[in-house]
Each structure stands twice: as structure tokens, then as C-alpha cells.
Amino acid sequence: MDDLLDLGEERRRSSATSGAKMGRRAHQESTQAENYLNSKNSSLTQTGEAPPPKPPRRQGGWADDSMKMAKLGKKVSEEMEDHRLRQQNLMGSDDDDIPVIPDLEDVQEEDFVLQVASPPSIQVNRVMTYRDLDNDLMKYSAFQTLDGEIDLKLLTKVLAPEHEVREDDVGWDWDHLYTEVSSELLTEWDLLRAEKEDPVGPSRYI
């Protein structure tokens, strides 16, 4: 029993001493490293050499993030397009659905410049003029009767010639037209007044 207690105390002592030794050694190593760095810096300052410059640190902002997101989105869209095209190729892999493109030798060259569309053919009845009607009335006696029963000779005798009926195309002027109409109305009113004032006929008693 005493032996066991002695062994436990020795273990405690050995562990305490070993922990202290390790702490001292570690402290010694750290002090040695600091001394080495201090001596190196002092030697550099004595010789006049500057320490090497630090490499530039790359800094990114929101633009880098947006470029990364754009590249990522483009990659995802390309993958989706490839997947869709693969599915279409698998679905349309039948030989019956493949269109046949004719060769250029089989296609006949046609000169479309020389091909002119034909004009439409429309039957238009020619309208007769007054002169044609007059000539027909004078030449052909058949036109002097309507439906073989009505005689049109009396009508053709009293028809006025064309030069009497035709009027010249004259532009209307408002002032000229107003004076002309007003003068005609005044003359008519004067005639009516004269008829009212004068007796209608010769007097019975003379």
C-alpha cells in the first residue's frame, strides 16, 4: 500500500517537472527567435538595406462579385441549353424527320426578270358620247322608234343642237354670282310691280 502511494507521488512530481521543463524550453525557443529577428533587423539597418517590399494585396469589390455571378449565370445557362439540345436530338433522332436538302445542280435556274405578269383582262363597255348618239339618230331610222311601237320623230325634231346646250366651264366668283342673281331678281320684281300698276287689259268704257 505504501509502495502504491509512493509511486503516485513520484508520478505527480515527474509530471510537474516535465510540464515546467516544456514551458521553459518553449519560452527559450521563442526568445531565441525574437533575438534572431532583432539582430537581423539591426544588421539591415546598419548596412542601409531596406527590407523587401510586401507583395500587393489584391482587393476586390462589388464589380468582382458581379463578374463572378455573371460568369456563373452564363455557365448555368449554357449547361441548360446543352441539356435541352441533347433532349431535342434524342427526340428527333428518327430518320423520317430529317429534311432532305436538294443539291444546287438539281435546282433549275429561273430568270424571274424576264417573266412579266400578264395584265388583267376586263371587259369595259364604251360609253357613247352625245355626238355618237346624234349621228346614230340621223343615220339609222331604227332608233326613231322605241320598242317598235313608240314613234320618236317628234322628240328628235325638237331636240336642241349640242352647241346650244353645251355651256362653257367657267369658275364661279362669289361677288360676280351675287350681283348677277340680285340683278335678275330686281328685274323680275320690277316687272311684277309694273303689271300691278298697269291695268290688265283695255278698258271697256272709252
UniProtKB/Swiss-Prot annotation:
The modification Phosphoserine is found at S77. It is found in: Cytoplasm, Cytoskeleton; Cell projection, Cilium. Residues 1-71 are annotated as: Disordered. Expressed in the retina, iris-ciliary body, lens and cornea. Higher expression is observed in the retina, predominantly in the photoreceptor outer segment. GO terms for cellular component: centriolar satellite; centriole; ciliary basal body; cilium; cytoplasm; intercellular bridge; intraciliary transport particle A; mitotic spindle. GO terms for biological process: cilium assembly; intraciliary retrograde transport. Pfam families: IFT43. Keywords: Acetylation, Cell projection, Cilium biogenesis/degradation, Cytoplasm, Cytoskeleton, Phosphoprotein. InterPro entries: IFT43. The modification N-acetylmethionine is found at M1. Its main location: cytoplasm. The keyword Nucleus does not apply. Transmembrane segments: none annotated. It comes from the Eukaryota. Residues 29-48 have a biased composition (Polar residues). As a component of IFT complex A (IFT-A), a complex required for retrograde ciliary transport and entry into cilia of G protein-coupled receptors (GPCRs), it is involved in ciliogenesis. Involved in retrograde ciliary transport along microtubules from the ciliary tip to the base. Component of the IFT complex A (IFT-A) complex. IFT-A complex is divided into a core subcomplex composed of IFT122:IFT140:WDR19 which is associated with TULP3 and a peripheral subcomplex composed of IFT43:WDR35:TTC21B. Interacts directy with IFT122, WDR35 and TTC21B. Belongs to the IFT43 family. This is Intraflagellar transport protein 43 homolog.
